[in-house]
């Protein structure tokens, strides 16, 4: 069975199970493409409400909850947030999103049990299915060559808020590389390597020359 066919089958199973048993069912963490596929199926299940959350506002990777329209009880997403920080700040490395994700996947888990990873300064926060929390707490002890401490975030106020800056200016042309170079105050050519094969519009891979209109 093709990957997309298996995914569609699983989503339909979750929706049907929710309706038949009058319960809430949850998907794994989904990427943007998978979320769009789920959204396209909503009309097939008018009796089911589909809601999403990634554990915090504006999360990219999100879990879908399926529940009957007239559900009479409250529920929560089975999502936990864990914080990673170096044991000894003095001897820690500069770690990237890729480093943290690699350390998690090297434990033998599937990407679908992990949500977003947010990196700020010397720490990182990541979201996971709560059934995996104890596993990560017990088994993740190093990221690259840095020994780390990992703890469960109990208070949402501990989660870092994004640092935003308003940028305005004039784009020479309506192109992705032009827009990003304006935002980061650098040349278009220097942005090409960050865009090609790494950016998506409605889940389709973009190249640097893409026109946005």
Locations of regions flagged by a protein language model:
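Single conserved hydrophobic/aromatic residue that forms the stacking wall/gate
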Residues: 201-213
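A generic "binding-loop/recognition-motif" signal
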Residues: 132, 187, 209
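A short glycine-leucine-enriched loop at secondary-structure breakpoints
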Residues: 184-185, 194
């Amino acid at each position: 069975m093709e990957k997309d066919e298996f995914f569609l089958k699983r989503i339909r199973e979750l929706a049907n199970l929710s309706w038949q048993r009058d319960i809430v069912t949850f998907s794994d963490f989904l990427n943007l493409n998978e979320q769009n596929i789920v959204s396209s199926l909503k009309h097939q299940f008018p009796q089911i409400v589909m809601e999403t959350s990634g554990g915090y506002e504006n999360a990219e990777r999100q879990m879908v909850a399926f529940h009957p329209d007239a559900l009479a009880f409250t529920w929560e997403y089975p999502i936990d947030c864990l914080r990673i920080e170096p044991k000894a700040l003095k001897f820690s490395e500069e770690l990237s999103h890729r480093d943290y994700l690699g350390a998690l996947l090297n434990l033998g888990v599937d990407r679908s049990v992990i949500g977003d990873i947010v990196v700020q300064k010397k720490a990182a926060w990541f979201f996971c299915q709560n059934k995996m929390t104890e596993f990560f707490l017990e088994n993740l002890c190093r990221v690259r060559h840095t020994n780390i401490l990992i703890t469960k975030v109990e208070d949402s106020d501990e989660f870092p808020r994004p640092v935003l800056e308003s940028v305005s200016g004039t784009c020479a042309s309506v192109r992705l590389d032009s827009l990003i170079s304006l935002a980061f105050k650098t040349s278009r050519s220097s942005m090409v390597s960050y865009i090609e094969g790494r950016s998506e519009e409605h889940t389709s891979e973009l190249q640097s020359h893409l026109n946005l209109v």
